[in-house]
Regions:
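An active-site-proximal structural segment forming one wall of the substrate-binding cleft
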Residues: 87-114, 135-153, 177, 250-252
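N-terminal carbohydrate-binding/catalytic regions of secreted carbohydrate-active enzymes
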Residues: 16-106, 210, 238-257, 263-287
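C-terminal outer-membrane/trafficking sorting elements
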Residues: 299-373
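Aromatic-lined carbohydrate-recognition surfaces of secreted/lumenal glycan-active proteins
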Residues: 16, 143, 150-173, 222-236, ...
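Conserved, mostly hydrophobic/aromatic
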Residues: 45, 112, 186-188, 260
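Distinct, well-ordered alpha-helical segments
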Residues: 27-30, 166-183, 239-240
Length: 373
């Protein structure tokens, strides 16, 4: 695997912004209200579109809200009424193709995440849904089928997002088994919630307890990773402290995460109090966490000097570097947010292949050569 130097991604903040009423949408008013609440701009705006019910025209109004706000719309594209084999067999092709044409005409970047949380038992495409006939194989094929239609229509402004739920539900579900392949995915993401004690079956869980298993399972997929849905109840613990802890993890052992999208809507009484502003303490913790992540972005160490002609690869868990000429340099390892994970001592390299002695070599990192004069 060749890991060429790439531009690091700044940490991004997004939300399903919620709002008044039972079915609030990301209108400009609701988006602005959430931005006022958190005291900063939203990079990503969440929207949920249902197959056949929400065509591109329904989506476009919110895509334009995002565009006018200087944000990117992230569409959770829900194939309600279809199982995976239905999609593979082309039963939704007309709707998908029309949507693709609309996205192409829109022209701005948009993120689409179809078939999200397929490792659960609650959606028609879920592997764990009893009697639905879904498998890891046909869910992955359904995802590829959707992407292929967009390619046939010449759509180039989509970032494809594959999402796993933080935990499996139902027989046969796996965290990564329905991954459609690197060719069909731009970003990977995780959805997860701390239900606290808002349900008879639930208990308070830390951020790590909710997300660590899925985060580790995605370690071998070499794509940028973000949290597409997240929230915490107030019941059973301290929501503000939970949020603070979440950002601490983003800065340490979850450093691969380049964006987080809060699901800010408290639904029916029998679900969760997911809205960000269930307490002022929770809002303050969110604001402080965002400020912390932005500060890390601004102070991340950048490679010194000028990069030489070099490439990196991983083999059997070891990092190898190939240079085209002799040089004096150190190797710097970054995460996707541009934060330094490790830096080697300065040493002299001859032209050729060199094994780099690093304790943290992995396929999720960015490697650069810092050349010294």
């Amino acid at each position: 695997m060749i890991l060429a130097p790439v531009t690091a991604m700044a940490f991004q903040v997004g939300a399903w912004v919620g709002g008044p009423g039972q079915y609030p949408q990301p209108t400009q008013q609701n988006v602005q209200a959430f931005q006022d609440l958190q005291g900063t701009h939203l990079d990503l705006i969440s929207y949920f579109a249902l197959f056949d019910i929400n065509d591109w025209n329904a989506t476009a109004q919110y895509a334009n809200v995002a565009k006018n706000n200087g944000s990117t719309l992230v569409v959770t594209w829900m194939a309600n009424g279809y199982n995976a084999q239905d999609l593979v067999d082309g039963k939704a092709d007309e709707y998908i193709r029309d949507y693709a044409k609309g996205v192409k005409g829109y022209g701005e970047e948009i993120w689409l995440r179809p078939l999200h949380e397929a490792n659960g038992d609650w959606y028609d495409w879920g592997v764990g849904k009893a009697g639905a006939g879904n498998t890891d194989a046909n869910v992955a094929e359904a995802f590829r089928h959707i992407v292929k239609i967009f390619k046939e229509e010449g759509v180039t402004n989509v970032k494809w997002v594959w999402t796993t739920n933080a935990s499996n539900a139902g027989k046969g579900s796996t965290l990564t088994g329905n991954y459609p392949g690197d060719e069909y995915v731009d970003y990977i993401s995780i959805d997860g919630y701390n239900w606290g004690k808002c349900q008879s079956w639930s208990s308070w869980q830390t951020f790590s307890q909710v997300f660590k298993k899925a985060y580790n399972a995605l370690a071998n997929i070499n794509k940028p990773l973000f949290i597409a849905e997240i929230s915490s109840s107030e019941l059973g613990g301290n929501k503000a402290e939970w949020i603070t802890d979440m950002f601490e993890h983003f800065a340490t052992d979850f450093s691969r995460v380049f964006a987080v999208m809060w699901f800010s809507q408290s639904k029916e009484a029998n679900e969760g109090d997911w809205a960000l502003n269930t307490s002022q303490a929770a809002v303050d913790a969110w604001k402080a966490g965002i400020a912390k992540m932005k500060a890390i972005d601004n102070t991340a160490l950048k490679p010194a000097g000028r990069a030489s002609s070099s490439s990196f690869r991983l083999q059997d868990g070891k990092l190898y570097m190939q240079t085209s000429k002799a040089l004096k340099a150190s190797v710097v390892q970054f995460d996707y947010q541009g934060r330094v994970l490790w830096q080697s001592p300065v040493q002299h390299f001859t032209a050729g292949v060199h094994a780099i002695d690093t304790p943290k070599a992995n396929a999720q990192s960015i490697y650069k050569l810092s050349v010294k004069r």
